[in-house]
Amino acid sequence: VNPIILGVLPKFVCLITKKC
């Protein structure tokens, strides 16, 4: 798995779910 994806995906989840 691309480590960049692992770094960016949580940020999108945070923004979408508003749970940071």
Swiss-Prot record:
Q: What name is this protein filed under?
A: Brevinin-1T
| Pfam families membership | Antimicrobial_1
Q: Which UniProt keywords apply?
A: Amphibian defense peptide, Antibiotic, Antimicrobial, Cytolysis, Disulfide bond, Hemolysis, Secreted
Q: Where can this protein be found?
A: Secreted
- Family listed: Belongs to the frog skin active peptide (FSAP) family. Brevinin subfamily.
Please list the tissues where expression of this protein has been recorded. Answer: Expressed by the skin glands.
User: What is one process in the GO biological process aspect for this record?
Assistant: killing of cells of another organism
Q: Which InterPro entries match?
A: Antimicrobial_frog_1
Gene Ontology CC entries for this record: extracellular region
Q: Which cysteines are joined by disulfide bonds?
A: C14-C20
Q: What does this protein do?
A: Antibacterial activity against representative Gram-negative and Gram-positive bacteria and exhibits a very high hemolytic activity.
